[in-house]
Amino acid sequence: LRDAGVAASDLSAVAVTVGPGLSMCLRVGVVAAQDVCAQHNIPIVPVHHMEAHGLVARLAGGTERVKFPFLALLVSGGHNQLILTRGVGDHVILGSTLDDALGEAYDKTARLLGLDVGGGGGPALEALAVEGDENAYKFPVPLRRRKNCDFSYAGLKTAVRLAVERDLGVPEGDAAFTAVCAPGQVPRPEHARVLTEAGMSDEAVEARHKTKADIAASFQKAAVKHLEERTKRAVEWAGDVLNEGEGTRGMASLSCIVVAGGVAANATVRESLSAVASDAGLPLVTPPAKWCTDNGVMVAWAGVERLALGLAEEPPAPWLGGDGDGKDGGERREVPLLPRWPLGSRDERATGETKSSKKKGMAAPLTPAGGEASDLVAPGIP
């Protein structure tokens, strides 16, 4: 606000993520947002984290270009989802991860290879893959026999681990790391590299680096191919959903494919999905890299879209009773946290997430099951 030259009293509302996520983390943001809203008597706009990832493409690409409906591929460390977005708060889940998300697979593979993951495992592995031969290892493309839009990376991760153990001889177990760890230091994959490469000739170290690059490139080829195949099918499924009503065949169509989330910053992912979009006759929209990872801009933009539709809550009272600090029996009226909050109803052809299949504690979807195509389009926002 200081950099923008805007005072808190000038704000029209405050948007804040209320789910999904860890309750402790969500609460920090919600409490701060409520304080500002209560102090300045302005509305608070609850935002779904994954919807924010998808909607920010409308800020990046322009609302005239990224019109509803569009297909969104949300790829991050914790999520892989293919979403038909028909409007603000109107989403159909066509596919999601059955176990591990792509971002997690990138991170774990980078660690297996002993890369420096201080700047993120994904960027480190992508940089190494440029030096490798993507055809050196025939890693399996996941779920090719399942004709749906779901994702799975657990099997691919296992194949990579076996290749690393076979061809790089990385020691197993914490005991192998302790020889190069300082007292009390947590063992990390790079310690295995130090231990294994100790005493090697320069030629051997170089050959070892080439093997790592080949594994990285081959992993990336299989991982991204999985994204390609699922996205191609999702384009078809989205068309089915949009035209499933009697007399609607051919009446509705996608405006574009949106790729968002942290992994969307990967250049190989963007290049591959550009080809998928081109084959489908659709533009591909990817937010700038700085808006692909978790950021405040995407939450603010989702707030703008929801506020324009009247999807906001009244300013919260500072405290109900007590002296205002909440420590003497006063109770605060708080915006509910929704740590387990599905983005929308699930297409009947989608398998769904087995990793989080328990229904206990699950909030109602942002988009109710059986919901009609949304009329929630803000005035002036196509």
Regions found by a protein language model. Give the residues of each.
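Phosphate/pyrophosphate-binding loops at sites that engage ATP/ADP/AMP, CoA/4′-phosphopantetheine
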Residues: L1-S12, T231-S255
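Glycine-rich phosphate-binding loops at beta-strand->alpha-helix junctions
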Residues: L254-L273
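Conserved phosphate-binding/catalytic loops in two-lobed NTP-binding clefts
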Residues: P46-V47, S255-C256, L273-V299, P315-W319
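Activation-segment/catalytic-loop signature of the eukaryotic protein kinase fold
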Residues: K212-V224, E228-T231
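Conserved phosphate-binding catalytic cores of ATP/NTP-utilizing and phosphoryl-transfer enzymes
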Residues: I42, P46-L71, A302
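Short beta-strand-loop/turn "lid" adjacent to the catalytic site in phosphate-handling enzymes
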Residues: L1-Q34
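Short beta-strand segments
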Residues: A15-T17, H48, L71-S76, I83-T85, ...
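A short helix-loop
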Residues: R65-F68, L74-V75, Q81-T211, S274, ...
